């Protein structure tokens, strides 16, 4: 009885870690898509500022991707 409840709790913990990694990936994908779309709108409005907009877009996307990578690594360490 006790062993089965411990195994069930461990399984739920692994499921939670996997869901956390999945949500982090989905959130990063949506965030980077939003960044790209907004940057394209801004470049369409002001083509002369495309260099600065593109630089800021790449930096912001890198920060979002870095946060997502940290979340995925943390979830991977917690799964064991």
Locate the predicted segments by residue.
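Hydrophobic, small-residue-rich transmembrane alpha-helices and their short perimembrane loops
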Residues: 1-80
């Amino acid at each position: 009885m006790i062993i089965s409840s411990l195994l069930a709790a461990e399984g739920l913990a692994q499921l939670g870690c996997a869901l956390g990694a999945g949500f982090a990936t989905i959130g990063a994908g949506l965030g980077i898509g939003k960044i790209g779309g907004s940057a394209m709108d801004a470049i369409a409005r002001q083509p002369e500022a495309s260099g600065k907009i593109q630089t800021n877009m790449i930096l912001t996307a890198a920060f979002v991707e870095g946060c997502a990578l940290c979340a995925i690594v943390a979830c991977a360490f917690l799964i064991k």
